[in-house]
Amino acid sequence: MKFPILLPNIFNHPFTYESDLDLKVGDYVVVPFGKSKITGVVWDEFEKKNNKDFKLKTIFKKLNVTPLKKTTIKFLNWFAEYNIIPKGMALKLVLLSSNAVEISQKDVFKIFKTKITTNTIKLSDEQQKSLRKMNISNEQFRVHVLQGTTGSGKTIVYFSALKEIIKKGFQGLILLPEIGLTSQFEKKFLEFFGIVPAIWHSGISKKRKEIIWSGVANGEIKVVIGARSSLFLPFKKMGLIIVDEEHDQSYKQDEGITYNARDMAISRASFENIPINLITAVPSIETYENIQKGKYSISRLEQRYKNASLPNYEIINLNETKLEKQSWLSKKIIDKVNSHLDKNDQVLFFLNRRGFSPHVLCSKCFNNYSCPNCSINLVWRERGAPLGPTVTRACLHAPCACRPSWGVGGHD
């Protein structure tokens, strides 16, 4: 019998093989390809017919792995077409190092025990209202946005939603924008659920990834917390996707296969016919537009959890504040910093990008240092050093008449 086998490579079509094995769509198999052996998946359609008569090769074996779901296959077909990549490259995102993992010993999954412990955390009335609006009991596709200020308890709300999903035997995925957030987030998860989640990102060892991949495929692992790539894990019974900090630009992958993980998560939820929650303090423009059109539902947390007070802050308008000579900090800021330093307190300055100054002005004539070719502001990097070029050698700037020592510049 003939079978269409999609391989994790640059081809946009499956290859036809023959076998006497009892195979169905989604089964993982090992096949000959050239002079090597490669893992592929029985796909849902054959390659386009041609007039050439090829001698078909025989499938070596069927792997003892839970088959890839038909809904996942449909998602990968759509993903490849939408992002203009070969279907084989889309499949490569699912397979671990271009292979499926056979793990027969179930004791390796003991660290990811599924028995949830009872916690004493109680939701506020506002949080309970948001949880009800999520409507997770309705196991159908819908996008819900949970918006709340920092410290409003958004995490506890969607943890509660996820808890109900796990109790029903489903699996959940929590997407985070940055790898650095996973370790801190893991502690919160352990405190709430009493179980260890599977952490997935590029920094995880190959052996650990093999265990997680297999555990997700056979349903032993119930919750995965990960970066963009975790979206392509072969979940056996996915029930809920949560995208934390949905507005974060880190969800966009710009190297290799380019895609927006937030948007692809919404699409995967649609193919799986499951709910997805977007968590944010400030919705992205795309999300806001969909809320306005009524495509996404939304609930808001206006108060901080347990009525915690907001930090005191003050905006200092530099247009109305006279600065000291040779200084770009107002006297009020300097006095505040000095008062804390006198008390042996610590002071932290947040800069919105690398470099000492992303916007360099001449303090005498207020000339703005920018690239003459692209108008991007030049960045001051080292104290006493020129504005070092970092992107293009074409960014040469004539020195300011007031500061002849400032010459060559560059931008980020």
Task: Give residue spans per PLM region.
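Accessory, non-ATPase domains that flank or precede helicase/AAA+ motor cores in DNA-metabolism machines
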Residues: 1-280, 287-288, 292-308, 342
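Gly-rich Lys/Arg/Thr-decorated short loops/hinges at beta-loop-alpha junctions or inter-strand turns
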Residues: 113-114, 244-248, 312-317, 378, ...
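Alpha-helix N-cap/helix-start and coil->helix boundary motif
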Residues: 179-182, 284-285, 355-356, 368
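A broad detector of the eukaryotic-type serine/threonine protein kinase catalytic domain
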Residues: 194, 247, 320-323, 376
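Conserved interdomain linker/interface between the two RecA-like ATPase lobes of SF2 helicase motors
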Residues: 268, 275-277, 284-290, 295-363
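Cys/His-rich short segments
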Residues: 328, 333-334, 341-384, 388-391, ...
